[in-house]
A protein has these predicted regions:
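Long, hydrophobic/aromatic-enriched structural stretches that serve as scaffold segments
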Residues: 14-27, 59
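Primarily the internal scaffold of c-type cytochrome electron-transfer domains
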Residues: 1, 31-173, 177-258
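N-terminal alpha-helical interaction blocks
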Residues: 1-15, 20
Length: 258
């Protein structure tokens, strides 16, 4: 834990659920004391037990080195959808090992049980409906007093709903592309941006030049974000006006729905 997290622990102790994606020691602790007991505790309670960084056993079976799922939340999310994750094919597993952590989630109930809100599907609309019916929100906006959901890091959901996921491209295809050394082909475990190795990632499927592919990413991902400060400033100004004394409550509630 870093210094800022330790300082935060003094003010408001974090749930031990926060350890879930931090170490291969987590599955061991879950097996020893039970999943419910692991979640329903404080972060500091396991500080002397969880000491190793993310490692091989988080994604690989220690005996066979096959890809496997080591975190219960993902298995449970599949089960609630009527799916058996143990029947997943290798190409899908090259994404699912990532989906153990790189997903949207929340801590359910007083026991802080780690839950993926996929019961109705993985689209934004389906997840929003799940939260609405559960009556859950991450916080209430200080100005508008509107309940707010804060997406954690829904990387897997975005990938699966996008064109690459629909075409069967896995997380590893782009972030851990295959390489060959000594006559052996294996996944590069130096996990990084696909743009760092375009010849082994994008250009496996896309025949455009490296410059064109980089520009495509810029146009889709970077350029829209640079316009954010303008609309954000206007939005905050609008919210401030809504909370002025001259705005009637009915008008405020109507506007807050948007």
């Amino acid at each position: 834990a870093n210094r800022r997290h330790l300082q935060g622990e003094k003010r408001r102790p974090s749930a031990s659920t926060c350890w879930t994606c931090k170490s291969p020691d987590v599955p061991r602790m879950m097996q020893e004391i039970g999943v419910d007991s692991f979640y329903n505790n404080k972060w500091a309670a396991f500080g002397d037990e969880i000491v190793d960084p993310i490692g091989c056993s988080d994604c690989h079976d220690s005996e066979t080195m096959d890809l496997h799922i080591s975190r219960p939340a993902l298995i449970e999310a599949f089960a609630r959808q009527g799916k058996d994750i143990t029947k997943t094919l290798l190409q899908a597993m090259r994404s699912l090992v990532c989906a153990q952590c790189h997903v949207e989630y929340y801590f359910k109930g007083d026991g802080k049980y780690l839950t993926f809100p996929w019961d109705k599907g993985m689209t934004v609309e389906a997840i929003e409906q799940y939260y609405d019916e559960a009556g859950f929100s991450d916080y209430t906006h200080a100005l508008s007093r509107t309940p707010i959901l804060k997406a954690q890091h829904p990387d897997y959901e975005i990938s699966q709903m996008g064109i690459h996921g629909q075409r069967g491209v896995s997380c590893a295809d782009c972030h851990m592309p295959y390489k060959s050394e000594g006559g052996m082909k294996f996944s590069d475990h130096h996990i990084q941006s696909p743009l760092a190795m375009i010849d082994r990632t994008c250009q496996v499927c896309h025949r455009e030049s490296e410059e064109t592919l980089r520009n495509n990413v810029y146009d889709v991902s970077v350029r829209p974000m640079r316009s954010e400060p303008v609309w954000k400033k206007n939005w905050l100004r609008h919210i401030s006006k809504l909370n002025s004394p001259g705005i009637r409550e009915r008008q405020r509630m109507k506007c807050n729905r948007y």
